[in-house]
Amino acid sequence: MLNRELVKGSTVILVLTLLNERPMYGYELVKEMGSRSGNELQMKEGTLYPSLHKLERQGYISSYWEKQEKGPDRKYYRITDEGKEVLAERTKEWSVFSAMMDRILKWSGQNG
């Protein structure tokens, strides 16, 4: 199981990345993250929904309700233009951070 703080710190980039592909509802986001991570990432809905609400308040995503033939209506989330800009920035930051961590960990492993 992944460290909860690592997951929490990655929520924004994960959500924006998935919503950049297509609108999704909350449970769909949880399942998609789990599926793509080989079920290593088990984000709880109680973690996801506060993040979705915060992203919506910040203007990075928007939401809309869609009627379902069967079952209750679903609230879908989609990325906004501002969210796409934030995603581009965060993706660059992640690449730099990830490469830096790889260098440090590799160096430490060779010299430890």
From Swiss-Prot:
PANTHER family: TRANSCRIPTIONAL REGULATOR YQJI
CDD domains per record: HTH_ARSR
Keyword Protein biosynthesis: no
Signal peptide: none
Organism lineage: Bacteria, Bacillati, Bacillota, Bacilli, Bacillales
Pfam families: PadR (PF03551)
Record's keyword annotation contains DNA-binding: yes
Name under which the protein is recorded: Putative DNA-binding protein YwzG
Entry-linked InterPro entries: ArsR-like_HTH, Tscrpt_reg_PadR_N, WH-like_DNA-bd_sf, WH_DNA-bd_sf
Any GO molecular function: DNA binding
Keywords: DNA-binding
